[in-house]
């Protein structure tokens, strides 16, 4: 099936999301809440595009909009730019300290609105990526709490989580750097909890926190061998080479 994006013919399969098709063809669509490791969420709505079918156009969220037939897609026309600019300023109101949001506002010439009251000191746009990463890749230690303008991401009762393993997946996927994580040579601190770091017994590289390694080993049903992924691969290669007489 062929659709056109900004006048460019793009091959695709029925059911593919517009964002996937655009990126595969080198067409830029801005996103915040999207990560290739997870299904689309449509939370930030920054990836809106206009889809025209049979002469009728409508604004859709490209990361969760599956193509079901031939259509024309516009990622940066006047209608899209106007709505995207409003979305960016609303996101800036939510996260005025985010340099990423400020850069996007400048890049897409988002109009300024004095009537929006900014939330002081915030970088979080409530995209939900951190919660999704923790739930799908780790232990589900964080969640959204409260409602309205007081809605935020937190551990239960804002106390150090008893189940958090300190893997840092939440901070890694955060698009605005809202989650604070700090490390020394021996410790990692995140969500007001400090974890002891484990180093590779061969090369000394940081592998992860003790809790993270225990959790991963338990899920895999294997014992931890004390090696990082690189040294483990090297050891396996050495075994193969020895057995082959190389």
What are these language model-derived features?
Residues 187-191:
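Short, intrinsically disordered linker segments that flank or connect zinc-binding domains
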Residues 2-167, 171-173, 177-180, 193-200, ...:
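Ferredoxin-type iron-sulfur electron-transfer modules and their immediate structural context
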Residues 216-220:
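Long terminal segments
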């Amino acid at each position: 099936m062929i659709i056109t994006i900004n006048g460019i013919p793009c091959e695709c399969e029925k059911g593919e999301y517009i964002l996937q098709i655009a990126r595969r063809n080198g067409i830029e669509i801005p996103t915040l809440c999207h990560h290739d490791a997870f299904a689309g969420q449509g939370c930030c709505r920054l990836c809106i595009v206009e889809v025209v079918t049979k002469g009728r156009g409508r604004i859709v969220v490209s990361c969760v909009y599956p193509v079901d037939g031939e259509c024309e897609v516009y990622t940066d026309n006047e209608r899209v730019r106007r709505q995207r600019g409003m979305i960016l300023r609303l996101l800036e109101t939510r996260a005025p300290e985010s340099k990423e949001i400020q850069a996007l506002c400048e890049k897409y010439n988002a109009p300024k609105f004095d009537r929006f009251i900014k939330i002081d000191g915030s970088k979080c746009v409530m995209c939900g990526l951190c919660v999704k990463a923790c739930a799908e890749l780790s232990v589900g230690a964080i969640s959204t709490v409260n409602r309205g303008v007081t809605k935020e991401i937190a551990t239960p009762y804002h106390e150090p989580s008893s189940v958090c393993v300190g893997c840092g997946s939440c901070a890694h996927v955060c698009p605005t750097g809202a989650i604070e994580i700090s490390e020394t040579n021996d410790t990692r601190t995140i969500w007001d909890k400090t974890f002891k770091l484990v180093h590779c017994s061969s090369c000394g590289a940081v592998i992860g926190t003790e809790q993270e390694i225990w959790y991963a080993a338990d899920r895999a049903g294997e014992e931890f061998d004390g090696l990082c992924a690189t040294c483990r691969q090297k050891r396996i290669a050495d075994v193969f080479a020895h057995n082959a007489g190389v």
